[in-house]
Amino acid sequence: MLQQLRDGKPTTIAFLGGSITQGAGAVPSQEMCYARKTYEAICERYTPDHGAHVRYIKAGVGGTPCQLGIIRYDRDITRDGAVQPDLIIVEFAVNDEADETKGLMHESLIQKIWSAPNEPAVVMLFSVFANDWNLKDRL
């Protein structure tokens, strides 16, 4: 995917998650959220045209766990198959704290993404609570 970016080929970078992806705590949230800042950093570092050929999709909804992420992946990211992202950054770890499936839904979401015909790259983002705890080991 990095070579695709460097070559100036059309590339789609998508972010799927909860309130952290939505931009909670960032002011203004649309410009200062981690998703936008990450997209801009990737474009600046890896593209010859500062991202003119890179599509940005942000699908963050506060309070949602990965169970809803599976549905939102189809609806908000791939738009029911019309879009094939090349990179998807997934952040649900905070909202999956009460996950009764012990990570099976999270795994199902990642498997669904990996099963796409274009085999997108996936980054799993695990936010850390103030006490340095996160769900990485549970998922």
Residue ranges and their predicted role:
Residues 6-9, 32-139:
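Alpha-helical cap/lid subdomain in secreted, periplasmic
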